[in-house]
Regions:
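Extracytoplasmic "Venus flytrap"
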Residues: 1, 7-12, 87-95
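Structural recognition of the beta-strand scaffold that forms the well-ordered cores
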Residues: 4, 25-29, 86-89, 111-114, ...
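Short helix-initiation/N-cap motifs at beta->coil->alpha
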Residues: 6-14, 113-128, 137-140, 239
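Hinge/capping helix and adjacent helix->loop/strand transition within the periplasmic-binding protein
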Residues: 17-24, 38-121, 125, 173-179, ...
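A ligand-binding cleft/hinge motif common to bilobed small-molecule-binding domains
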Residues: 30-44, 94-106, 120, 128, ...
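C-terminal lobe and pocket-closing loops
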Residues: 143-216, 248, 255, 264
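Mature extracytoplasmic/periplasmic domains
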Residues: 169, 206, 217, 221-244
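Extracellular/periplasmic bilobal clamshell ligand-binding domains
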Residues: 237-265
Length: 265
């Protein structure tokens, strides 16, 4: 079995999907390249709905984190802000930029400053008071738990029901934008995928999926993830991912794909 590591282009996914033998080539990848296929980007020559999924690192939770001393310690206070609230982000395609853009599309007074070269730099900027907030995965504070423990930042909105009493992102946007939210949040909801080409024989895919589940439950594997600061969500089984991916592709209409691209502006 050959494993292909992520590359800065959808080419490996294209190879696995369109030319790889059904028995041997697999791709370990963040879901972003599968989104390229879901939105029917001309650069992608693969259909993510047809690939064989072995498993993933699983669902994670993100939140909108704010410095309470900025005057915003709840989503209601954010909505009441008289001026747009600045959030730090990496780049136009990162979730810390696209999720706030989706909120802004729905009337939430936020704007994003992009260009930080790492989430750690954004967290440092927040700590130093340069920007008051960030949309960030909870596990992203693994190296800076003090920011949460000392309430330098507090969550005011979340993507999964983790923090009691906090509103969910999907509940504060228009119902018509929820398919768009599914696309924006796909990275955290699919996790890091292990995917192979279409038409892998059922007995082989079942064996691979069983092995992936066994690995995910292994304490040494979990300890390795913790040491490497790899986000650890709730692992997803391959058949679950396949069903989710088909739904994502089916619900990503041309209008949704166009709206997704506009969030990058």
């Amino acid at each position: 079995m050959a494993i292909q590591q992520p590359a800065p282009a959808p080419a490996p996914s294209e190879h696995v999907s369109t030319t790889a033998q059904p028995s041997y080539n697999f791709r370990a990848a963040a879901v972003v390249w599968f989104i390229v296929g879901a939105v029917k980007n001309p650069a992608a020559r693969f259909d993510p709905a047809t690939m064989t999924y072995v498993g993933s690192s699983g669902v994670m939770n993100s939140a909108l984190w704010m410095r309470p001393d900025s005057g915003i310690a709840s989503f209601a206070q954010l909505l009441a802000a008289k001026e747009k609230v600045v959030l730090g982000a990496l780049n136009a395609t990162s979730q810390d930029s696209m999720a706030p853009a989706l909120l802004a599309r729905n009337g939430v007074p936020v704007r994003v400053i992009r260009g930080y070269n790492s989430s750690a730099k954004v967290l440092l900027a927040i700590e130093q008071g340069e920007v008051p907030g960030i949309f960030h995965i909870v596990d992203g504070f693994a190296k800076r738990p003090d920011l949460i423990e000392n309430k330098v930042v507090v969550p005011v909105l979340q993507t999964q029901p983790m923090f009691p009493g906090l509103p969910l992102l999907r509940d504060v946007i228009r119902a018509s934008d929820r398919p768009l939210a599914n696309l924006v949040l796909a990275g955290e909801e699919f996790g890091v995928l292990l995917a192979g080409p279409p038409a892998i024989p059922a007995d082989r895919s079942a064996l691979l999926r069983q092995a992936f589940t066994t690995m995910s439950d292994d304490k040494d594997y979990q300890a390795d993830l913790a040491r490497m600061d790899v986000p650890r969500g709730t692992p997803l089984a391959g058949d679950t991912i396949a069903s989710m991916m088909r739904t994502l592709v089916e619900t990503t209409t041309p209008d949704i794909a166009a709206a997704y691209e506009r969030l990058k502006e």
